[in-house]
Regions:
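Alpha-helical transmembrane-segment detector that highlights a single hydrophobic TM helix
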Residues: 54-82, 93
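Mid-bilayer segments of alpha-helical transmembrane spans in multi-pass integral membrane proteins
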Residues: 70-75, 98-115, 136
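N-terminal signal-anchor transmembrane alpha-helix
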Residues: 1-53
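Structural signature of hydrophobic alpha-helical transmembrane segments
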Residues: 1-11, 59-71, 100, 125-133
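Short, highly charged, low-complexity non-transmembrane loops/tails of multi-pass membrane proteins
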Residues: 149-160
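C-terminal ends of transmembrane helices
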Residues: 14-28, 75-90, 142-146
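Cytoplasmic-side transmembrane-helix entry/capping segments in multi-pass membrane proteins
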Residues: 26-40, 59-64, 88-97
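Hydrophobic alpha-helical transmembrane segments in multi-pass integral membrane proteins
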Residues: 43-57, 102-118
C-alpha cells in the first residue's frame, strides 16, 4: 500500500470511528474489533516499521507510540457513557471528553512523528495504522469490560 493511500485510509477510519463513537450504539457489537484488527494487519504488512539507519531510536519511538495508543484507548473507553435500558440491554455513547481524548491522541501521534523527523528517523505510514488500530482494539475491549461490570437491572418483584 502506498503512503498516501495508507494516510487516507487512516483518516477515513479515524473519521468513521469518531462518528460512530459519538452515536448511541449497543455495547458489544460483534464486528467492533474487525476494522481495528484489519488496520493493525495492514500496518504490519507494510513493513519498514524500523529505520535501519536509526534502529534503536525508531524502535523506542514505535514502542512509545504503541504504549501511548494503549493508554489513550483506555482513556477513551472511560470517557464513554455506558448504561442499561429498561430491558437490560447495554448501550454506550461518546461524550465531549471522548472527542478531547481523540484530539490528544492525534496530537500525540503528530508529536511522535515530529520527534522522529527531527531525529532523522525515516518514518513509514504503517505505524499510524498500527497506532490507531491498537488504540481502537483497547478501547473496544475496555468498553465491553466496563459494561459487564454495570449492575444488572433490578429484578422484578414477584407478588404472591
Amino acid at each position: 500500500m502506498n503512503e498516501q493511500l495508507a494516510i487516507l485510509l487512516a483518516l477515513a477510519v479515524l473519521a468513521l470511528s469518531i462518528y460512530r463513537q459519538m452515536r448511541t450504539r449497543p455495547v458489544g457489537e460483534g464486528r467492533a474489533l474487525v476494522l481495528p484488527l484489519v488496520l493493525i494487519a495492514l500496518g504490519a504488512a507494510q513493513g519498514h516499521l524500523v529505520d535501519g539507519d536509526h534502529a534503536a531510536l525508531s524502535i523506542w519511538l514505535l514502542a512509545g507510540e504503541l504504549v501511548v495508543g494503549v493508554v489513550l484507548g483506555l482513556v477513551r473507553a472511560y470517557t464513554m457513557r455506558i448504561w442499561r435500558d429498561e430491558s437490560g440491554r447495554l448501550w454506550r455513547r461518546g461524550t465531549p471528553w471522548t472527542i478531547a481524548a481523540w484530539i490528544v491522541a492525534i496530537a500525540t501521534r503528530a508529536g511522535f512523528v515530529a520527534a522522529g523527523i527531527s531525529a532523522g528517523v525515516a518514518l513509514e505510514t504503517g505505524s499510524i495504522l498500527i497506532f490507531f488500530g491498537l488504540s481502537l482494539v483497547v478501547q473496544a475491549v475496555a468498553v465491553v469490560a466496563r459494561a459487564r461490570s454495570t449492575a444488572p437491572p433490578a429484578a422484578a418483584t414477584v407478588k404472591a
